[in-house]
């Protein structure tokens, strides 16, 4: 990615996307990875794919900063210094 510290977040759901946005807002270069092209298209167009208080403004700010990159390829995550995996887990209830 660059000389600036970077992190990849795999899974841009209700945990991963807000986390990725917070990392980017704090100055990290972030690669967000998700297999769902609907999610990626929504984020690229500046729209949150779900309702979460405060995240729409955060997404807009992060997009202006240029610190968020998106990919549908999990292998791209290896370019970052650190990787966080936030994928759904099954419910046993």
Task: Describe each model-derived feature in a short phrase.
Residues 1-93:
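Structural/interface elements that position substrates and couple domains in central-metabolism enzymes
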């Amino acid at each position: 990615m660059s000389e600036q510290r970077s992190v990849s977040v795999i899974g841009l759901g209700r945990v991963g996307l807000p986390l990725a946005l917070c990392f980017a807002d704090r100055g990290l270069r972030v690669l967000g990875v998700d297999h769902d092209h609907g999610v990626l298209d929504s984020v690229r167009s500046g729209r949150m794919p779900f309702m979460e208080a405060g995240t729409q403004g955060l997404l807009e700010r992060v997009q202006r900063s240029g610190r968020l990159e998106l990919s549908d390829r999990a292998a791209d995550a290896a370019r970052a210094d650190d990787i966080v995996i936030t994928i759904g887990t099954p419910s046993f209830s």
